[in-house]
Curated annotation (Swiss-Prot):
Subunit structure: Binds DNA as homodimer. Interacts with protein E1; this interaction greatly increases E1 DNA-binding activity. Interacts with protein L1; this interaction enhances E2-dependent replication and transcription activation. Interacts with protein L2; this interaction inhibits E2 transcriptional activity but not DNA replication function E2. Interacts with protein E7; this interaction inhibits E7 oncogenic activity. Interacts with host TAF1; this interaction modulates E2-dependent transcriptional regulation. Interacts with host BRD4; this interaction mediates E2 transcriptional activation function.
Residues spanning the membrane: none
Region (Transactivation domain): 1-200
Pfam families assigned: PPV_E2_C, PPV_E2_N
Record HAMAP family: PPV_E2
Subcellular location: Host nucleus
Name of the protein this chain belongs to: Regulatory protein E2
Organism: Human papillomavirus 69
Domain of life of the organism encoding this protein: Viruses
Positions with biased composition (Low complexity): 252-263
Keywords: Activator, DNA replication, DNA-binding, Early protein, Host nucleus, Isopeptide bond, Phosphoprotein, Repressor, Transcription, Transcription regulation, Ubl conjugation
Gene behind this protein: E2
PTM description: Phosphorylated. Sumoylation plays a regulatory role in E2 transcriptional activity.
GO BP: any one term: DNA-templated transcription
Region span, Disordered: 211-283
């Protein structure tokens, strides 16, 4: 018994030395786990001799001694093989080589530099879970150790095992566990990955001409006369009178005078839209002088639809939001228009609502 006490004292003294050393060399971590194996063997031998205490320490049960010894042996052998690979010269701390991290998903792999991945289930900010994506993953093959990067997509968190994706977190299973399993959003490194199961259409879908923006539902149809931009003073011709009477209504007096038509153009500078809110043209009598502040969101159609759905949680921060639309050109990008009562409300919206980096926002002013 005295011999076992002396051996245990010497072993634990060296273990404490490695704790204080806080080395980042793999060789030191291998020596540390060799001492842990030795400590487990001493405790197992003491239990076989029916010893309940040794050096004022309670001797674990035989089952516990075996389990800890197997863990130490497994990790010690894995570190020795890693030492013989090209990654043996990298920095390895005691935290990087602990057994708890070794058996954390992905299991039986060494991992470094974890980043947090937050998943929001069912668009409920109160129903979130955090997961770890490892920047570096070291896994063992028949040819030796390999190093790869951890990745994340809408399905889960994975690493590339050869040419195959090895998922170690399945967001679908997590969504069934913590929510309805129908929808979830992945937030990682300032980006948002939307669940494609919620977005039914694809980016190639054609937008129907019947899909019009809510804020523009009451606007009158523009004629070619209102879209042209003459730059000179001209005499209003007689045929123009009947056309203007139809636009202005039967009771509106008609005058044939020399008028200067203002330039009504939409200028785009530094992602800010400016337009003239007033007009002296009598032919535009049906246009309202109401001016609203707007934000155009431009990007992938599916992302815009999912983003627009999340706007329901922030109804007090905007006035109206349009459906997804696009210009009549060969482009897959869609546009969503949001209107605001004031510039302050718009600023509050942009501060509160997270806009993904894949979506570009353009500020502007529009007359209704």
């Amino acid at each position: 018994m005295e011999n076992l006490c002396q051996r245990l004292n010497a072993c634990q003294e060296k273990i404490l030395d490695y704790y204080e050393l806080d080395s980042d060399k793999l060789s030191d971590q291998i020596d540390y786990w060799k001492l842990v194996r030795y400590e487990c063997a001493i405790f197992y031998k003491a239990r076989e001799g029916n010893m309940q205490c040794i050096n004022h320490q309670v001797v674990p049960s035989t089952t516990v001694c075996k389990e800890k010894a197997w863990q130490a042996i497994e990790l010690h052998i894995a570190l020795q093989s890693l030492m013989n690979s090209e990654y043996g010269k990298e920095k390895w701390t005691m935290r990087d080589t602990c057994y708890e991290l070794y058996v954390t998903e992905p299991k039986h792999c060494f991992k470094k530099e974890g980043t947090t991945v937050t998943v929001v289930f069912d668009c409920n900010k109160e129903n979130t879970m955090d997961y770890i994506r490892w920047t570096s993953v070291y896994y063992k093959t028949d040819m030796g150790w390999c190093k790869t990067n951890g990745e994340v997509d809408y399905k889960g968190i994975y690493y590339m095992h050869g040419c195959c994706k090895q998922y170690y977190v399945d967001f679908k299973q997590e969504a069934l566990k913590y929510g309805t399993g129908l929808q979830w959003d992945v937030h990682v490194c300032g980006q948002v990955i939307c669940c494609p199961e919620f977005v039914s259409s694809t980016s190639g879908d054609q937008i129907s001409t019947a899909q019009t923006a809510e804020p523009l539902s009451n606007n009158t149809t523009q004629t070619p006369e209102t879209t042209c931009v003459p730059r000179c003073t001209e005499e209003t011709p007689a045929p123009e009178t009947a056309k203007r009477r139809r636009l202005s209504g039967p009771n509106t007096p008609v005058t044939t005078t020399s008028v200067t038509r203002p330039r009504s153009s939409l200028e785009h500078t530094d992602n800010v839209l400016h337009s003239n809110s007033g007009s002296n043209n009598p032919g535009r009598g049906t246009c309202s002088d109401q001016t609203v502040f707007i934000v155009h969101l431009k990007g992938d159609t599916n992302c815009l639809k999912c983003l627009r759905y999340r706007f329901k949680k922030h109804k007090g921060l905007y006035c109206k939001v349009s459906s997804t639309w696009h210009w009549t050109s060969n482009t897959n990008q869609g546009i969503v228009t949001i209107t605001f009562d004031s510039e302050t409300q718009r600023a509050s919206f942009l501060t509160t609502v997270k806009i993904p980096q894949s979506i570009t926002s353009t500020l502007g002013i529009m007359s209704l």
